Amino acid sequence: MVKNSVISVISQEEKKGSVEFQVFNFTNKIRRLTSHLELHKKDYLSQRGLKKILGKRQRLLAYLAKKNRVRYKELINRLDIRETKTR
């Protein structure tokens, strides 16, 4: 499973406060909530939580893209997420 290999790599390389680790945790939460919401479509509290986590992850990714573009590209490729839209 891809998730387990990413966990071992990130947890060994990074500290828990790093941007990469935080984005990784948010991505796991997003995937869990998405699968939960597929079963429970009217769980509006979980929908709100998902939107909040998506916003936090988006802000962290924008920060990382601004500070270090190479680390940003590696992270989005490793986590298999789309690149954020730039204005």
Swiss-Prot record:
Listed CDD domains: Ribosomal_S15p_S13e
Gene3D superfamilies: S15/NS1, RNA-binding
GO cellular component, one term: ribonucleoprotein complex
Biological processes per GO annotation: translation
Localization of this protein: Plastid, Chloroplast
Molecular function (Gene Ontology), one example: structural constituent of ribosome
SUPFAM superfamilies in the record: S15/NS1 RNA-binding domain
Key word Chloroplast present: yes
Highest taxon, organism lineage: Eukaryota
Coiled-coil segments: none
UniProt entry keywords in alphabetical sequence: Chloroplast, Plastid, Ribonucleoprotein, Ribosomal protein
Quaternary data: Part of the 30S ribosomal subunit.
UniProt record similarity statement: Belongs to the universal ribosomal protein uS15 family.
Name of the protein described by the UniProt record: Small ribosomal subunit protein uS15c
